[in-house]
């Protein structure tokens, strides 16, 4: 029996996407999505992050592509993404439960826009080249799910005592 894979963060699994509309508060600012929070974290000047609070995920990503990255971004981005994902799920209990409900499914951020860092691109070119994505977002989501499951299990034991 093969392990279940969730390979698209759309439809019933849209909640896994950073584009999912949900409030995410990070460093005292509340954004409309995890994508906006992540893109804001690229800013050198913390006050510039406020501009991301009211924009859609698409606009946030477009702005994030144009700004000068803060020093050390390449080394820090995985940790920042983990912080954003933790904030998203710890602040939105229904989303946390939905993540837990994915069980032990492998979460793969499948895409067709050549993102082989955060996900796994399934476009014809990447498939023909045999490119294997790193699926960093999927890994971070699975780590967050594991932490949530442990917290829920500990809470259940405490309630029984």
Residue ranges of model-derived segments:
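Charged, low-complexity intrinsically disordered segments
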Residues: 1-161
């Amino acid at each position: 029996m093969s392990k279940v894979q969730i390979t698209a963060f759309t439809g019933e699994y849209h909640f896994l996407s950073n584009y999912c509309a949900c409030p995410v508060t990070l460093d005292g600012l509340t954004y409309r999505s995890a994508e906006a929070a992540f893109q804001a974290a690229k800013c050198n000047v913390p006050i510039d992050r406020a501009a991301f609070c009211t924009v859609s995920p698409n606009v946030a990503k477009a702005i994030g592509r144009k700004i000068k990255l803060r020093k050390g971004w390449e080394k820090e981005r995985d940790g920042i993404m983990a912080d954003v994902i933790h904030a998203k799920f710890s602040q939105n209990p229904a989303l946390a439960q939905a993540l837990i409900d994915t069980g032990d499914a492998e979460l793969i951020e499948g895409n067709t826009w050549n993102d082989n860092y955060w996900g796994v691109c399934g476009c014809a070119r990447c498939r023909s080249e045999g490119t294997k994505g790193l699926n960093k977002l999927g890994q971070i989501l699975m780590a967050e799910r594991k932490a949530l499951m442990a917290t829920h299990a500990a809470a259940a034991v405490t309630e029984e005592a």
